Amino acid sequence: ERCSPHPHVYTDRVLRLGYFSSQPISLLTALCGNGDRVDLLVVAPGTGIILNNEIDDFSIQPGTPNTYGLIGIDANSIQPGKRPLSSMSPSIIMENDRPVLIVGGAGGPRIISAVLQTILNVVDFRMPIDKAVEGARIHHQWLPNDLAVEPGIPAETRASLERRGHKVRERDNLGVVQAILVRNGKVFGKADPRKQERGG
């Protein structure tokens, strides 16, 4: 199958700061019948180059917030041979040398929170995969110094967080995940309903 760049990757126009921040990440989470598992992004054939907007993870302008509100720092400025800080965290949870949970996500700095909370929902709280993925989330990224919570977080939990000194702010869509759970020899997949395009 042929692979060609997104039409907006090559342009002679000057694009506004943050333009590429709005482009989505394509993520695939899969488990094969023979037990092979993968959590990956798209790679251009024969190049090893991941096709995504990862270059946006560099600080375009140190001291200036990006689309997600992260303040850029000079140490993360774009330079030849450098890798940007990244929140991508495809995860495969193993038990007795077998995959039991495969999780990956999209959503910039919110990816780590979304993936971790999905894993905790399954491993610690023993939730079925659909409830684990759909569960309300929280996210804190240091700057801005507020704790984002989705609408489903109970009022008593919010009040408890505020009593501890957190500045709580309600936000929709704190990351999007795809997950596969293997339990009792059966495979269950779930694509996050926070995203319009669905898989699983």
What are these regions (language model features)?
Residues E156-G200:
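In a subset of proteins, long, contiguous C-terminal domains/tails are tracked
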